[in-house]
Design a protein with these regions (language model features):
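Walker A (P-loop) phosphate-binding loop of ABC-type ATPase nucleotide-binding domains
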Residues: 38-42
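Short, charged/small-residue-rich alpha-helical element at the C-terminal edge
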Residues: 227-298
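Conserved ABC transporter NBD signature motif
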Residues: 59-70, 74-75
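Catalytic Walker B motif of ABC-type/P-loop ATPase nucleotide-binding domains
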Residues: 157-161, 166
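Conserved ABC nucleotide-binding domain
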Residues: 115-137
């Protein structure tokens, strides 16, 4: 499988601040790869380096086998980029801004295929292209960048919090467009802190913390790293006593709940069957639980800061 993005030991320092501290990331061709972490973890810095907008301090970074700093012009012809906070020209209409962005990637407003795609996307995203940029809300500015990105085919889509400011219906349209470009063979790097979005869209996920990738793999692979929740009808936690591999046994809301290492679930089922439990549910860990495995301590610290609201 061809690797589209590769970084190894990537570092970026701003003075004494280490924004990236040995980041290793691999994104293969045709994947939708989730890049997950809170603000300040290093996601946007990584993306700026991959786009040739920032120069790395150390380590290696390549896109399509080329250096993103030295070969930025050639690479930008193959890349569509959507930031999380879009600025538009105040005196250009939305349609003019879209056409200008598309021209930078080789499209022309006289190209019938491009104009048809632009109009389809404007309708799908419920976007009014005749208004001036200064009249657009944050969500509509986001639509300008999304339409410009999706209207011209790209080999790689780098999307940094792309649904910021969109309402739920427009988020659905965004997911449809990701499915479309994926089916066409494009590669997508999706940076987000919206766990449900990443879980629905991505083939693989990399979790970043303090400038390093701390977990990377498919959701199935990552789920093996944490426990699965098992529950059944009952009011007494003693009903689960003695089950091999059971952890965190509690009874609440008429159900007995416990957790078990994900690779031990199959071995536990005969034990549960022997106890004639009813209403059995087995829930694999969600992406949120995987995420909290690495960031739970930070959230506890924030909740304990001052009045509990965090800063």
């Amino acid at each position: 499988m061809t690797t589209v993005i590769r970084t190894g030991g990537l570092t970026k320092h701003y003075g004494r601040v280490r924004a990236l501290d040995g980041l290793d990331l691999t994104v293969d061709e045709g994947q939708v790869h989730g890049f997950l972490g809170p603000n300040g973890a290093g996601k946007s810095t990584t993306i700026r380096i991959l786009l040739g907008l920032a120069r790395k301090t150390g380590g290696a970074a390549s896109v399509f086998g080329q250096d993103p700093w030295n070969d930025a012009v050639a690479l930008h012809r193959r890349i569509a980029y959507v930031p999380g906070d879009v600025s538009v020209w105040p005196n250009l209409s939305g349609g003019e801004a879209i056409d200008l962005m598309a021209r930078l990637r080789g499209a022309s407003r006289h190209d019938k295929a491009y104009t048809a795609e632009r109009e389809r996307l404007a309708e799908a995203f419920q976007f009014e292209p005749r208004k001036k940029g200064r009249a657009y809300s944050k969500g509509n500015r986001q639509k300008v960048a999304l339409i410009a990105a999706f209207a011209v085919p790209a080999d790689l889509y780098i999307l940094d919090e792309p649904t910021s400011g969109l309402d739920p219906l427009m988020e659905v349209m965004f997911r449809h467009e990701i499915a479309r470009v994926r089916a066409a063979g494009a590669t997508v790097l999706l940076s987000s802190h919206i766990l449900s979005e990443v879980e629905q869209l991505c083939d693989r996920v990399s979790i970043i913390r303090a400038g390093r990738v701390v977990e990377s793999g498919t959701l199935a692979e990552l789920r093996h790293l944490t426990r699965t929740e098992v529950s059944f009808e009952g009011t007494d936690a003693a009903a689960a006593a003695g089950i091999p591999g059971a952890h965190d046994i509690v009874a609440d809301d008429g159900r007995v709940r416990l957790t078990v290492d994900s690779d031990a679930v199959a071995g536990m089922l005969p034990e549960l069957a022997a106890r004639n439990v009813t209403g059995l549910r087995v829930a694999p860990p969600s992406l949120e639980e995987l995420f909290l495995r690495h960031y739970g301590d930070d959230l506890v610290a924030l909740e304990g800061n001052g009045d509990g609201r965090g800063r």
